[in-house]
Amino acid sequence: MQIKEVDADSSIQAEEVNYYSEGHLCKGYIAYDAKMKGKLPVVIIVHEWWGLNEYARSRARRIAALGYFAFAADLFGDGKLGRDPEEARALTARYYAHPENTLKPIEDAITKAGDFPQADISKAGAMGYCFGGYVVVNAAKLGAPLKAVVSFHGRLVGVEAKKNLLRAKILICQGADDSLVPEADQVAFRKSMDSINADYTFISYPGAKHAYTNPEATELGQKFNMPIAYNAAADFASWEDMKLIFHTVLK
């Protein structure tokens, strides 16, 4: 099974929004169901290392269709995109080298979401893909005001978790055949989470490689000689697991 795209004639409203983070202009993207009454729980979405592209926007629309106010954040500023791994590596370097840099962009995205009358930022969650998964998990560990965080095939390195800072329930959706997230990193992550009795769930999807949620991953992997591939079954299963945690914690 595959995740159903939002129909063009649905009541989902979506638009690009400008906001500032650390003094830089960012071009985010919001989506929400105009038929929903009252304020909606917020889900911040962080893109892959390719940037806030149509894939990330489509996920925002799907989140909106579930009854959330979706805010796709722009972590590179000015809507920059990585056209190849070299550019993407340069755009993500400041975050991978200094994981503490992940906190402010998430806080700023939540603040901007709060400007919209449809958004209830007291019920905020976050999700991210690859690079984005790394970002949202580290931001949560640094104390971001999030109730639930979901990482899809994200790197599991970064800051050490501290019980007094981590407030979110965490879901890790990991591909069992992901060679870009070493087993040693997975073991270290679990050990760190267990050491503070963190509320987390770690799910491994059989046969899934890195970037398994992106329908373009197989083509990109072939183009750039990267060990990534789309896996429809894992994409669907992880989406269902994400839906459950957000419904349980945010609604």
Predicted regions and their residues:
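Serine-hydrolase catalytic machinery in alpha/beta-hydrolase-like enzymes
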Residues: 3-10, 16-116, 215-229
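Short alpha-helix in the alpha/beta-hydrolase fold that links the catalytic acid
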Residues: 59, 182-192
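Active-site loop/turn elements of alpha/beta-hydrolase fold enzymes
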Residues: 68, 75, 154, 205-207
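Short beta-strand/loop motif that positions the catalytic acidic residue
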Residues: 172-174, 178, 205
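Acidic catalytic loop of the alpha/beta-hydrolase fold
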Residues: 177-181, 210-211
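C-terminal catalytic histidine-bearing segment of alpha/beta-hydrolase fold enzymes
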Residues: 199-251
